[in-house]
Protein backbone atom coordinates (compact mmCIF):
# COMPACT_ATOMS: atom_id res chain seq x y z
CA UNK A 1 0.00 0.00 0.00
CA UNK A 2 1.25 3.49 -0.80
CA UNK A 3 2.39 5.80 1.96
CA UNK A 4 -0.53 7.66 3.52
CA UNK A 5 -0.48 11.48 3.40
CA UNK A 6 -1.30 11.49 7.13
CA UNK A 7 -0.43 9.51 10.24
CA UNK A 8 -2.83 6.60 10.77
CA UNK A 9 -3.06 7.28 14.51
CA UNK A 10 -5.79 4.72 15.15
CA UNK A 11 -4.24 1.97 13.00
CA UNK A 12 -7.30 1.70 10.82
CA UNK A 13 -7.22 -0.97 8.13
CA UNK A 14 -7.18 0.08 4.46
CA UNK A 15 -10.82 -1.00 4.26
CA UNK A 16 -11.75 1.13 7.27
CA UNK A 17 -9.91 4.13 5.84
CA UNK A 18 -11.74 3.74 2.53
CA UNK A 19 -15.14 3.37 4.22
CA UNK A 20 -14.44 6.39 6.42
CA UNK A 21 -13.41 8.46 3.42
CA UNK A 22 -16.52 7.45 1.48
CA UNK A 23 -18.82 8.28 4.41
CA UNK A 24 -17.15 11.66 4.88
CA UNK A 25 -17.64 12.38 1.17
CA UNK A 26 -21.34 11.51 1.52
CA UNK A 27 -21.57 14.00 4.37
CA UNK A 28 -19.84 16.68 2.26
CA UNK A 29 -22.34 16.04 -0.57
CA UNK A 30 -25.13 16.41 2.02
CA UNK A 31 -26.23 12.82 1.47
CA UNK A 32 -26.78 12.72 5.21
CA UNK A 33 -28.94 9.59 5.43
CA UNK A 34 -26.37 7.57 3.52
CA UNK A 35 -23.53 9.03 5.58
CA UNK A 36 -25.34 8.17 8.81
CA UNK A 37 -25.99 4.60 7.65
CA UNK A 38 -22.35 4.18 6.60
CA UNK A 39 -20.97 5.51 9.89
CA UNK A 40 -23.37 3.36 11.93
CA UNK A 41 -22.39 0.27 9.93
CA UNK A 42 -18.72 1.01 10.61
CA UNK A 43 -19.52 1.47 14.29
CA UNK A 44 -21.15 -1.99 14.41
CA UNK A 45 -17.89 -3.51 13.17
CA UNK A 46 -15.67 -1.40 15.44
CA UNK A 47 -17.74 0.00 18.34
CA UNK A 48 -14.94 2.09 19.82
CA UNK A 49 -13.58 3.61 16.61
CA UNK A 50 -12.74 7.19 17.57
CA UNK A 51 -12.84 8.64 14.01
CA UNK A 52 -16.30 7.16 13.45
CA UNK A 53 -17.57 8.39 16.83
CA UNK A 54 -16.23 11.88 16.11
CA UNK A 55 -17.84 11.90 12.67
CA UNK A 56 -21.18 10.81 14.10
CA UNK A 57 -20.95 13.59 16.68
CA UNK A 58 -20.27 16.07 13.88
CA UNK A 59 -23.05 14.67 11.70
CA UNK A 60 -25.66 14.79 14.45
CA UNK A 61 -24.57 18.11 15.90
CA UNK A 62 -23.66 20.29 12.94
CA UNK A 63 -25.53 18.69 10.07
CA UNK A 64 -28.73 17.31 11.65
CA UNK A 65 -29.09 19.53 14.76
CA UNK A 66 -29.68 16.44 16.90
CA UNK A 67 -27.67 17.86 19.77
CA UNK A 68 -28.40 15.17 22.35
CA UNK A 69 -27.13 12.47 19.99
CA UNK A 70 -24.04 14.53 19.21
CA UNK A 71 -23.29 14.82 22.93
CA UNK A 72 -23.68 11.04 23.34
CA UNK A 73 -21.10 10.31 20.64
CA UNK A 74 -18.62 12.88 21.92
CA UNK A 75 -18.99 11.40 25.42
CA UNK A 76 -18.09 7.98 24.00
CA UNK A 77 -14.93 9.52 22.54
CA UNK A 78 -14.08 11.12 25.89
CA UNK A 79 -14.55 7.82 27.74
CA UNK A 80 -11.66 6.45 25.68
CA UNK A 81 -9.66 9.66 25.27
CA UNK A 82 -10.35 12.03 28.18
CA UNK A 83 -7.80 14.52 26.81
CA UNK A 84 -9.39 14.76 23.35
CA UNK A 85 -9.79 18.54 23.12
CA UNK A 86 -11.88 18.43 19.94
CA UNK A 87 -14.48 16.08 21.45
CA UNK A 88 -14.51 18.01 24.73
CA UNK A 89 -15.09 21.35 22.96
CA UNK A 90 -17.79 19.98 20.67
CA UNK A 91 -19.56 18.25 23.55
CA UNK A 92 -19.54 21.52 25.50
CA UNK A 93 -20.98 23.39 22.49
CA UNK A 94 -23.82 20.95 21.97
CA UNK A 95 -24.58 20.66 25.67
CA UNK A 96 -25.31 24.40 25.61
CA UNK A 97 -27.71 23.89 22.72
CA UNK A 98 -29.45 21.09 24.63
CA UNK A 99 -30.17 23.47 27.51
CA UNK A 100 -32.04 25.99 25.32
CA UNK A 101 -35.80 25.69 25.50
Q: At which residue positions do the language-model features occur?
A:
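TPR-adjacent "capping" and linker segments in tetratricopeptide-repeat scaffold/adaptor proteins
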Residues: 2-18
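Residue-level recognition of tetratricopeptide repeat
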Residues: 24, 58-59, 93
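Structural signature of tandem alpha-helical TPR/SEL1-like repeats
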Residues: 2, 28-41, 64-76, 97-101
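Alpha-helical segment of the N-proximal tetratricopeptide repeat
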Residues: 13-45
Amino acid sequence: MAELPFKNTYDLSPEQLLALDEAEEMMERLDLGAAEAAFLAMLEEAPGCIPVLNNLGHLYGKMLSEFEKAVEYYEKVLQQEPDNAWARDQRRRYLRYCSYD
